[in-house]
Amino acid sequence: MKDNIHPDYHEINVVMTDGTEYKTRSTMGKAGDTLRLDIDPKSHPAWTGVHRMVDTAGQLAKFKKRFEGFGIKSDNS
């Protein structure tokens, strides 16, 4: 096996949507970094049965603004 080809595997903190925190090991970021989840098993529609819109940092608004002129025109316009 080749040496020095594997990423650093270290401990990080994970914060769920309800504020619950736990530690796990990952190759993400640096040791001690925090991963904040937008959707987790406690809030995901597949497990809760409730649909909710998550707009992280205005991405949905930015998308709508960018493509607002590409819709189907109605007869009223």
From Swiss-Prot:
Molecular functions (GO terms): rRNA binding; structural constituent of ribosome
Statement: the UniProt record of this protein carries the keyword Ribosomal protein: yes
Cited Pfam families: Ribosomal_L31
Segments passing through the bilayer: none
Superkingdom of the source species: Bacteria
A cellular component term, taken from the record's GO annotations: ribosome
One of the GO biological process terms: translation
Keywords: Ribonucleoprotein, Ribosomal protein, RNA-binding, rRNA-binding
InterPro entries linked to this entry: Ribosomal_bL28/bL31-like_sf, Ribosomal_bL31, Ribosomal_bL31_A, Ribosomal_bL31_sf
Family: Belongs to the bacterial ribosomal protein bL31 family. Type A subfamily.
Self-association state and partner proteins as the record states: Part of the 50S ribosomal subunit.
Purpose of the protein: Binds the 23S rRNA.
Name of the protein this chain belongs to: Large ribosomal subunit protein bL31
Organism of origin: Paramagnetospirillum magneticum (strain ATCC 700264 / AMB-1) (Magnetospirillum magneticum)
Lineage: Bacteria, Pseudomonadati, Pseudomonadota, Alphaproteobacteria, Rhodospirillales
